[in-house]
Amino acid sequence: MTDSNPTRCGYVAIVGRPNVGKSTLLNHILGQKLAITSRKPQTTRHNMLGIKTEGDVQAIYVDTPGMHKANDKALNRYMNRNASAALKDVDVVIFVVDRTKWTDEDQLVLERVQYVTGPLIIAVNKTDRMEEKAELIPHLQWLQEQLPNAEVMPISAQQGHNLEALEAQIAKHLPENDHFFPEDQITDRSSRFLAAELVREKIMRQLGAELPYQITVEIEEFKQQGHVLHIHALILVERDGQKKIIIGDKGERIKRIGSEARKDMEVLFDSKVMLNLWVKVKGGWSDDERALRSLGYGDL
């Protein structure tokens, strides 16, 4: 007797401009926080896999940096190259757009995804915020005209609206394959990477308008000792002024950053965490390809 539900497994790229809700979408699909989020553009810098196994279906989501026009620094080039590379060798592409707003960077992404030959889904995000759903129809029709071969689906990444339907549509397009990852694995990234990203998220959320984008985080120690996980994180900035901003008056800001990051780490790693933060000035790191490679930014 044959199984009527074949085993399916494949890769799903989530692409779009910065700050459109890609990482929020991934987190909601996975049912837990994996990708960092903030209201600031370019929060995501690396491609990261989020793996969801449900019964016979394993969907391997590739969360990508937002495609953007700035290409002047090595870090910007790295992020754009990562996002474009995700369109290759995947089985499904999800193009996340806003319910009403359309920018030059959305157009940039559209020009890339129009060459996708496989299944393409346009996920129109934040539709829960519209009082009159009928107002959405012209935008959906316009998107369909731009990409006639795509499926257009209204969603809310934040509230989870219509995500079950989105996942069902994705599953239909995944090829028949054995699963590539164990059922309980949710990402390809190391615990060190996830810890560094959590610190960076708290920095972005704490700094607001003062945010210096030339910030990265390096984990210097990650060691379990008994029931306590000891993490030492180095925050790199490019100027002394940025260092002062992060530390804050009498060290209050860096204390808040550390406290918020530690809380999330304890949930993620299911352990008591002792987190120590330092801030160091490394001038020009975001435009230094050798420095970026040493900090884990891969090929540039």
UniProtKB/Swiss-Prot annotation:
One of its GO terms (molecular function) is GTPase activity. It is a peripheral membrane protein. InterPro entries: G_ERA_dom, GTP-bd, GTPase_Era-like, KH_dom-like_a/b, KH_dom_type_2, KH_sf_prok-type, P-loop_NTPase, Small_GTP-bd. It is found in: Cytoplasm; Cell inner membrane. Keywords: Cell inner membrane, Cell membrane, Cytoplasm, GTP-binding, Membrane, Nucleotide-binding, Ribosome biogenesis, RNA-binding, rRNA-binding. Residues 125-128 are annotated as: G4. It comes from the Bacteria. Residues 8-176 form the Era-type G domain. Residues 42-46 are annotated as: G2. One of its GO terms (biological process) is ribosomal small subunit assembly. Residues 199-283 form the KH type-2 domain. One of its GO terms (cellular component) is cytosol. Residues 155-157 are annotated as: G5. Residues 16-23 are annotated as: G1. Gene3D superfamilies: 3.30.300.20, P-loop containing nucleotide triphosphate hydrolases. GTP binds at residues 16-23, 63-67, 125-128. Residues 63-66 are annotated as: G3. Belongs to the TRAFAC class TrmE-Era-EngA-EngB-Septin-like GTPase superfamily. Era GTPase family. Monomer. An essential GTPase that binds both GDP and GTP, with rapid nucleotide exchange. Plays a role in 16S rRNA processing and 30S ribosomal subunit biogenesis and possibly also in cell cycle regulation and energy metabolism. This is GTPase Era. It comes from Pseudomonas putida (strain ATCC 700007 / DSM 6899 / JCM 31910 / BCRC 17059 / LMG 24140 / F1).
